[in-house]
From Swiss-Prot:
This is Bottromycin D. GO terms for biological process: defense response to bacterium. NCBIfam families: bottro_RiPP (NF033414). Residues 10-46 form a propeptide. GO terms for cellular component: extracellular region. The precursor peptide is first ribosomally synthesized and then highly tailored by specific enzymes to yield the final natural product. These modifications include several methylations, cyclization and the formation of t-Leu and Thia-beta-Ala residues. It comes from Streptomyces sp.
Length: 46
């Protein structure tokens, strides 16, 4: 469920509607910066 949540968060823009994801969003943002290469590309697609 760990990795699934990560991808889910990125796909749903960190699911801002979910307060639980608010904590993840901090970690996710750092993760995105790490692999922001392909993440940035996906963001443009969406």
């Amino acid at each position: 469920m760990g990795p699934a949540v990560v991808f889910d968060c990125m796909t749903a823009d960190f699911l801002n509607d979910d307060p639980n994801n608010a904590e993840l969003s901090s970690l996710e943002m750092e993760e995105l910066e790490s692999w922001g290469a392909w993440s940035d590309d996906t963001d443009q697609s969406v």
